[in-house]
Amino acid sequence: MTPAHKSDRLNLPFMQEAALLAARIGLASLFLFSGCQKLMHLQGAAEWAASQGVPFASLLMPLAGLFEVASGVMLITGWHARQAAAALAVWIIVLGPLFHRFWDAPPQLWQISVDDLFHHFVMFGGMIYVVVFGPGSWRLGRPKS
């Protein structure tokens, strides 16, 4: 009798689903935090956005905060996760370069601006992964089998 293969002793489907959930939580955490910060500090967020050239910042920042929180919750719960990830991917790819303009940054802030922009591109890659492969089976709204 041959010994069981190591993967036979592991519950791979469980581990894969746990990993997908952990990835969704990780991806969503940035947006939950950012959205909550905008909503809790609306005046400061609007002033900062206005200083970056955002028109109607006082109106747009609460909407941005709500969008980020709602999308983050959808991503974590897996409820319409592909749609939330697609919306966040567009959000990232459009707003990342607008707010992290390393080419305009003073020398002492250049590296931070570059790093922030590339962090956004990494998040974009994660969102595309969710769009293409889905949230996994641990999600709300999953059809009953």
Q: What name fits each language-model region?
A:
Residues 40-56:
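Membrane-interface interhelical connector segments
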